[in-house]
């Protein structure tokens, strides 16, 4: 296991394009930021971003994301927590491999992360596919190491079965009838339509009107650009999972479910919060950048709400 300061790792500082009160102006403003790595039990080197002291708060990013996009959240939350952001296999600074590209293996990686860093208890916060990784982790390893849970805008089932009622589709958040069509749309490989893939998520993947997201995304593009070929390998498995039973039978910890009025599956987020034993829904309004990228666009508001939940 290795650990370097962020400036040692990247070899230089980085200045963000926008100066925003309460957020870093440059990478070196995130005091104590370190980049570490560890080996999984199948020999893959995974990286993580770390700063702060206190109860561990572990972020599991969504598909294609990594610690660079979380730089603002790290800066804010390190005042109260030992903050970690895990770069999953084929993501960010972690190894790019052609094996183990399924959600169950990603959750095993999360378990290996807890073991390697000797973390006995932590808050867990997942976003998008990162939620699925946590759901799989709970399914396979239980919740003994979890204090509280937070989930950001992930549908319980992306894939819609042809024999589901409309009520089932809405509660599951399903928005595609073809994993292949969804992957093709994500990669711009061919035409799509609302029947095959019903989402406008890409319309909101923009830094326009979101200077905080422009800052974190600029670090992401400069230092940790995505390997799109490697990222594609996990998508089919990710799309085809149905996690609804996890909320019905497995999750017992206090749970915050965060979404926005722009989300195509916001009703499924309300369903999760209503279904788990101790759940709470937090819905960002449209004028609060209430879309799939809300925590990156509004890091100050999101961090404040997350802290209030964790400290309650």
Language model: regions and residue ranges:
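Alpha/beta-hydrolase fold catalytic core
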Residues: 1-57, 80-81, 119-120, 147, ...
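Flexible "cap/lid" loop of the alpha/beta hydrolase fold
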Residues: 146-188
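Conserved HGGG/HGGXW glycine-rich cap/lid loop of the alpha/beta-hydrolase fold
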Residues: 44-96
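Active-site loop/oxyanion-hole signature of alpha/beta-hydrolase fold enzymes
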Residues: 41, 49, 85-129, 140, ...
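Catalytic active-site module of serine/aspartate enzymes centered on a nucleophile-bearing elbow/loop
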Residues: 279-312
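Conserved serine/cysteine hydrolase catalytic core
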Residues: 223-274
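Alpha/beta-hydrolase active-site loop signature
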Residues: 64, 88-92, 131, 156, ...
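Conserved hydrolase catalytic core segment
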Residues: 120-163
